[in-house]
Design a protein with these regions (language model features):
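Short, well-ordered coil/turn segments that N-cap beta-strands
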Residues: 42, 102, 129-130
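General small-molecule cofactor/ligand-binding pocket signal
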Residues: 45, 65-67, 132
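Short beta->alpha linker loops
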Residues: 50, 115, 137-138
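Beta-loop-alpha module in the N-terminal Rossmann-like domain of NAD(P)-dependent dehydrogenases
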Residues: 64-123
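Rossmann-like NAD(P)(H) cofactor-binding subdomain of soluble oxidoreductases
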Residues: 89, 109, 132-138
């Protein structure tokens, strides 16, 4: 993980509740909503999906805002994005998130090609954002 500059490091106080946007409102999103209730340091506040009806349904079910992907990426209130898209989209979505100025947590795999994964790591390091992917959810 890249070292964080003072501005970004200050956003990681122990008392901060991170506001998170979710991209990809399929079945795995349900797992994140169920699991996130056990944590007090982040709150999912909005969702987006290429299928706007799926985003609207998810937003209504979990009482959050439904947005387009562009709206989510441009939302200054959101600190980080959960990338829950299909594996073939992980690279492109994570790249857009990093370029929009947000931290990103991606479902596995980080990318479908090793070189694309290395590119994301380099971009996160260059932009000084956290890029995370983990096999175990909670």
């Amino acid at each position: 993980m890249a070292s964080l500059n003072k501005d970004k490091a200050s956003s990681f106080s122990m008392n901060k509740v991170f506001k998170v946007g979710l991209i990809g409102c399929g079945h795995i999103a349900e797992t994140y909503f169920r699991g996130h209730q056990y944590f007090n340091n982040f709150k999912i506040i909005a969702c987006a999906d290429i299928n706007q009806k799926a985003a609207d349904k998810c937003a209504k079910l979990y009482n959050i805002k439904s947005k387009t992907v562009n709206e989510l990426l441009n939302d200054k209130e959101i600190d980080a994005i959960l990338n829950l898209t299909i594996p073939q989209s992980h690279y492109s979505v994570s790249k857009r998130v990093l370029n929009s100025g947000k931290h990103v947590y991606s479902e596995k795999p980080l990318a479908t090609y090793f070189e694309k994964g290395k590119e994301l790591v380099a971009l996160a390091k260059k932009r000084n954002f956290i890029l995370a992917m983990h096999q175990t959810l909670f």
